[in-house]
């Protein structure tokens, strides 16, 4: 049966458990539109990513 050779220290145990914490998602303010978006994701309102037009957003008709 596999048994640890040394006792795991409190610090090492804490480092391992820190990855289990639930963290709030990160948002950044878009430079062009001023909208909040996730980093490294396309801005859904404008369709831009890193200065390039990825797609043209659909215009929603309000009735």
Swiss-Prot record:
Highest taxon above the source species: Bacteria
Stretch list, region Disordered: 1-22
Molecular functions (GO terms): structural constituent of ribosome
GO CC annotation, single: large ribosomal subunit
Biological process according to GO: translation
InterPro entries: Ribosomal_bL32, Ribosomal_bL32_bact, Ribosomal_zn-bd
UniProt cross-references to SUPFAM superfamilies, sorted A to Z: Zn-binding ribosomal proteins
Entry annotated with the keyword Ribosomal protein: yes
Comp. bias regions, Basic residues: 1-16
Protein keywords: Ribonucleoprotein, Ribosomal protein
Signal peptide: none
NCBIfam families xref list: rpmF_bact (TIGR01031)
Protein family per UniProt: Belongs to the bacterial ribosomal protein bL32 family.
The protein, known as: Large ribosomal subunit protein bL32
Organism: Beijerinckia indica subsp. indica (strain ATCC 9039 / DSM 1715 / NCIMB 8712)
């Amino acid at each position: 049966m596999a048994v640890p050779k040394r006792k795991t220290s409190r610090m090492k145990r804490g480092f391992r458990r820190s990855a289990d914490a639930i963290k709030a998602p990160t948002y950044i303010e878009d430079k062009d539109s001023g909208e909040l978006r996730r980093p490294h994701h396309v801005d859904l309102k404008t369709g831009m990513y890193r200065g390039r037009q990825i797609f043209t957003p659909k215009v929603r008709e309000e009735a």
